[in-house]
Amino acid sequence: MKAFIAVLGTGMALAGMVAGVATAAQPGGPGQIARGQEKYEYWCATCHAGDPREGGRYLPGTASLNAKYKGERPGALADRTDLLPPYVKLVIRRGMEGMPFFRKTEISDAEMEDIAAYLARNTKQ
């Protein structure tokens, strides 16, 4: 009986975790996405904008992602369809490869949530 209760408890915990991940992966509403776009333009687009600059060159973040994915995924973050909010938030706070991290004094938790919602808006669930 104890083994059954332990298995049942583990199963319920896993179900709760899966439900929590599914809920966390949903992008926010129109207001949050609009705020996220504004913050993305200010903090992120300086390196990750999708349009080429003078001379046809992309910005450093977009260029490095274009080279990394070799056409399998867009280099421009705003064009991606595979970004989940938890991943976006992790990269904002910890940085990645050549990208710096951002402190809470630079991008607040609320702003980070908005940016994550904006970048996840096209993600297929």
Regions found by a protein language model. Name each.
Residues 70-83, 87-122:
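Axial heme c-ligation environment in periplasmic c-type cytochrome domains
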Residues 30-31, 37-76, 90, 98, ...:
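Periplasmic/extracellular electron-transfer cofactor-ligation site
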Residues 1-30, 123-125:
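N-terminal export/targeting leaders of redox proteins
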